[in-house]
Amino acid sequence: MMIINLFITLTVIRGEHTMAEDNINGMNQIAQTERSAPTDFNFAIGTWTVKHRRLKDLLSETKEWIEFEGSSTTRTILGGFGNLEDNVLHFPNSSFRAAAIRSYDPNTKQWSIWWLDGRFPNKIDVPVVGEFKNKVGLFYAEDVLNNIPTKVRFTWDSTLPENPRWEQAFSTDNGITWQTNWSMSFLRAN
């Protein structure tokens, strides 16, 4: 190992460019990138109990709400530039798993969030994209639900980090009005 380090040092002193030097520089870039990872979702890291409130039919005019419990565990991935949220949802008639996958783009300074429902393992939702301001994150996407063009909005509110909240809302009139159809209240598990 000392001979390799000596070779790299002598090569660099002579001004020659080596693959080993590229590897060292690449590792330095990775380390620098990981040090500057975003902290927007740090509040979500850990294990939570979740209270859900959801419209029975998401695009319906009826306002019949269902309430149920769940749990969630979130951990960082991608050197802090992403996180993975593993959920268990206990609907009134059945339980299932789902995952939220989040990644941060340092060039746009925006997050993308994908939802994968365990009941439909071959379909991942269109990502919502957005950012946090003053501990509130707004994320948007355009999708087609029940053959209706629909704007989707996720809102993450971390102003109370010990009790963060998430909401989903849909708009079928191009964002003029929004109908909140699902909310989650998180409480850190013991």
Question: What do the PLM-derived regions correspond to, one by one?
Answer:
Residues 17-190:
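Hydrophobic small-molecule pocket/channel-lining residues, especially in calycin-type beta-barrels
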